[in-house]
């Protein structure tokens, strides 16, 4: 069978657990992603099984003889290095970035600090711990401003604020999901996203997707549960803009130490067409509305082959030492 244009020995993949569901605020989306991945792998003849860490102990993976895991978990405990660390201890290879890269990428503030240090463009921001500090951030960054939890995804807990009065409620909402609240400069312009596949020097960007949401509001509902959002792939952007985005996202991916696959979100500022990195998702959605499969289709890679190729890239952070025998 083929994945990413290469031949893959399905039997060599062994017994596979598709990790789905979990305990995060993104459980519903994860169940949809995992169900799609499971069907795709089964269609290739992979010995794949659904496994929900919210309902079963991860230690059962070893007891039941699983050889590798496809992580279709999103958000806390699945995308933040937690499950990756458990799988490292169990010695079971898994898809996506490793422990440190997953943990850093889940923390938007830490990610932005690293990107800025490396000279990568990202919107200005403030870390706040109260509604009062949120108001002060609005004065510093200007309106409108984005207020969101530092460690959530799928726009959960996110608010776009225009006035000081809106800051209080926005802070309360974001802090329900994370004590660390990020206030971020709003970039007016084109919203785009770009997947990256591969590892190290082999990492490469897939085609850019341009997103046009109703009234510019690409929220949780418009991401997953409506058909009102329009996705353009090919993006329709000038060739030099697309090339620059692809170059930046590969740098962003490598800078955080990612491997396997991820997807970066970028805004292109309307005033000067400068791209700004917003965040990187280390376990992107794989639902019917998801963007990595859409980008892959644009270069002739089917959903089924995409899933197989990602699974084949499963790895551990470090080689497992041989067990010593008494």
Curated annotation (Swiss-Prot):
Keywords assigned: ATP-binding, Cell shape, Cell wall biogenesis/degradation, Cytoplasm, Ligase, Magnesium, Manganese, Metal-binding, Nucleotide-binding, Peptidoglycan synthesis
Record text on cofactor binding: Binds 2 magnesium or manganese ions per subunit.
SUPFAM superfamilies according to UniProt: Glutathione synthetase ATP-binding domain-like (SSF56059), PreATP-grasp domain (SSF52440)
Compartmental location: Cytoplasm
Molecular function per GO: ATP binding; D-alanine-D-alanine ligase activity; metal ion binding
Positions contributing to ATP binding: 138-193
Pathway recorded for this protein: Cell wall biogenesis; peptidoglycan biosynthesis
First-level EC class: ligase
EC number: 6.3.2.4
SMART domains linked: GARS_A
Cellular-component GO terms for this entry: cytosol
Biological process, per Gene Ontology: cell wall organization; peptidoglycan biosynthetic process; regulation of cell shape
Reported function: Cell wall formation.
Stored HAMAP family: Dala_Dala_lig
Similarity comment: Belongs to the D-alanine--D-alanine ligase family.
Listed name of the protein: D-alanine--D-alanine ligase
Source organism (scientific name): Delftia acidovorans (strain DSM 14801 / SPH-1)
Origin organism lineage: Bacteria, Pseudomonadati, Pseudomonadota, Betaproteobacteria, Burkholderiales
Gene transcribed to yield this protein: ddl
